[in-house]
Regions:
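Hydrophobic secretory-pathway targeting helix
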Residues: 1-38, 189-193
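Juxtamembrane interface at the cytosolic side of transmembrane helices
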Residues: 2-12, 162-210
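Juxtamembrane extracytosolic/periplasmic "stalk" immediately C-terminal to the first targeting helix
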Residues: 38-45, 200-205
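Long, solvent-exposed extracytoplasmic domains/loops
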Residues: 48-147
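Short, aromatic-rich amphipathic segments at membrane interfaces
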Residues: 127-176
Length: 210
């Protein structure tokens, strides 16, 4: 095979692959932009803002991201992760001592049974049991709302991470396409400069030894 033909084949193939990488890069960029814009719009619509730096409690100040985002509106995936884990997570721990919505179900049910029995028996501690039930019910309701919001924010963070990964993939595609374009251009230049009758890896003539 002639060297020029081989150069042209590799160069054209490289150009085709570069175009393919560019197309994949554009698709990934489009998906990344959609993910980022969607997360931004959904979070911005909730009108959630971080506490100003001057209003942070001692426990909240221990969080680097709460200090970093202090006073800002929550609009990005990283901010959502911070708010969910460092702010909501902290306050959920203080509300019920780290117990979850499911954990509080058993004591709530037990107190309901005790209240029902106390009402039938007209027990003297009925008012105290009713207060305990009201407190546990309020805690469980608050924890449920907090866990729900925390879960939604972490879902937004996860969605934004898909967008970030797509951006990284798009960058890799663009760099790969640029490299292939350069190599293909070099191959075309070499093909033009190569004599038309030049062969690729022509066999060496045998040496005649006396």
């Amino acid at each position: 095979m002639k060297r020029r033909t081989l150069d042209l084949l590799f160069s054209i193939g490289g150009l085709g692959l570069a175009v393919l990488l560019l197309v994949v890069g554009v698709v990934l960029t489009t998906n990344a932009n959609f993910a980022n814009n969607y997360v931004h719009d959904q979070l911005a619509a909730q009108h959630i803002s971080f506490k100003p730096a001057g209003q942070l409690t001692d426990e909240e100040r221990k969080s680097a991201c709460l200090r970093e985002y202090a006073g800002q509106q929550l609009t990005t995936g990283k901010q959502a992760e911070c708010y969910a884990n460092e702010f909501i997570g902290l306050h959920l721990t203080s509300i019920a001592g780290g117990k979850t919505y499911a954990d509080l179900g058993e004591p709530q049910t037990a107190l309901r049974e005790q209240v029902a029995q106390a009402e039938q028996a007209k027990a003297a501690n009925l008012a105290d049991l009713q207060k305990q039930l009201a407190d546990v019910s309020a805690q469980r309701d608050t924890v449920f709302k907090g866990e729900t919001l925390r879960g939604l924010l972490l879902t937004s963070y996860g969605f934004s991470e898909f967008g970030r990964k797509a951006e990284q993939g798009a960058l890799a595609m663009y760099l790969g396409a640029a490299l292939l374009l350069l190599l293909s251009a070099a191959g075309l230049v070499h093909a033009v400069r190569t004599p038309a009758n030049a062969a690729f890896a022509a066999p060496e003539q045998e040496r005649i030894t006396n």
